[in-house]
């Protein structure tokens, strides 16, 4: 495991998490799965998250190279990795996997900050949204990871905007 010191504070409201240079610009949201990794991107103003790509997880680490490439290609100023805590707010094996991936990616894309964001139930929420949109179950597999990444990133953007607005008013 790579030292966690490469990662930045994990909460969008952290004063330390709003460093100069990370105000405007695209953010990437990442949903870490055991087989596939969903990636979403925001607009430069940080208002709307949209699906970007599904990256196949490889033992060789090729997925990390692809994620780092996407950070560069999109000119991302920040990367948000979903942290799937348990409902009891504990870190299980899936969360540890996300932490490890975030640490490895942070080492590759430094000085771009890589943060963790709570993502409990985002895949369930993404599945429900796809089902309600009429996407058949067998077709969901191709886009579910991207939809979960969109949910993670959009929630983070919304929370960050709310907290930044509260600071500006206070």
Swiss-Prot record:
Residues 1-29 are annotated as: Disordered. Keywords: Cytoplasm, Hydrolase, Nuclease, Ribosome biogenesis. It is found in: Cytoplasm. SMART domains: YqgFc (SM00732). It comes from the Bacteria. One of its GO terms (biological process) is rRNA 5'-end processing. Transmembrane segments: none annotated. Its EC number is 3.1.-.-. One of its GO terms (molecular function) is nuclease activity. GO terms for cellular component: cytosol. Belongs to the YqgF nuclease family. NCBIfam families: RNAse_H_YqgF. Could be a nuclease involved in processing of the 5'-end of pre-16S rRNA. This is Putative pre-16S rRNA nuclease. It comes from Mycobacterium marinum (strain ATCC BAA-535 / M).
């Amino acid at each position: 495991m790579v030292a966690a010191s490469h990662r930045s504070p994990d909460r969008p409201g952290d004063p330390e998490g709003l460093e100069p240079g990370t105000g405007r610009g695209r953010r990437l949201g990442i949903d870490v799965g055991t087989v596939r990794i969903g990636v979403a991107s925001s607009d430069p103003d940080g208002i709307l998250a949209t699906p970007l790509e599904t990256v196949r997880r490889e033992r060789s680490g090729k997925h990390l190279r692809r994620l780092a490439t996407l950070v560069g290609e999109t000119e991302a100023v920040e990367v948000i990795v979903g942290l799937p805590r348990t409902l009891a707010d504990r870190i299980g094996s899936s969360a540890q996997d996300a932490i490890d991936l975030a640490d490895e990616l942070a080492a590759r894309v430094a000085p771009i900050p890589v943060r963790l964001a709570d993502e409990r139930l985002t895949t369930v929420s993404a599945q429900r949204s796809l089902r309600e949109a009429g996407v058949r179950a067998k077709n969901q597999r191709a886009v579910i990871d991207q939809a979960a990444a969109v949910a993670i990133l959009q929630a983070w953007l919304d929370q960050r905007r709310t907290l930044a607005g509260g600071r500006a008013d206070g």
